[in-house]
Amino acid sequence: MTSLILAAALACAAAVAEAQSVKPVSVWSGVYTAAQGKRGEELHAAACVMCHGPRLNGASQPEMPPSPAIARDSFIRKWAGRNVAALFVYVRHTMPPDAPGTLTDQQSIDAIAHMFAVSGMPAGDRELAIDQGALANILIEAQPK
């Protein structure tokens, strides 16, 4: 498992190096589609709600396993300054905690789109691509004022 995460991190680093010649875009610039966010919402209801709660606020009930908020300000503060490629690698290889790495690439990217939608980030015309170079070029940041 550790070697798999290390390999994914190295691939992500290579993608970041490749993307550095292109001006990054913000998660606030419509980087996913509404349909992608909806697929992520359906996945969340089936596989994520028991840990992250129905509103993605993290463990809100004593019977829930400890888990962080994965949307809104808490999520943005934790991930600000990183790119979506890093988030994709994290979700893809560590979720769900009881069966890490079992989400497909598509499920992982759809889950991220849902996190963005719940965080108030606007949908756009193009889906988040399962492409480390493209994802490395999308910056997670607080909403511009």
PLM features: what roles do these ranges have?
Residues 2-13:
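Bacterial N-terminal signal peptides
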Residues 12, 17-28, 137-145:
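Compositionally biased, proline/threonine/alanine/serine-rich low-complexity intrinsically disordered stretches
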Residues 18-43, 59:
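Electrostatic cytochrome c docking/interface patches
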Residues 31-34, 55-90:
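Gly/Gly-Pro-rich "capping" loops immediately C-terminal to redox-active cysteine motifs
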Residues 38-49, 63, 81, 105:
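Sequence context surrounding c-type heme c attachment/ligation sites in exported
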Residues 40, 44-55, 111, 115:
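The canonical Cys-X-X-Cys-His
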Residues 100-145:
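Flexible coil segments in periplasmic/lumen-exposed cytochrome c-class electron-transfer proteins
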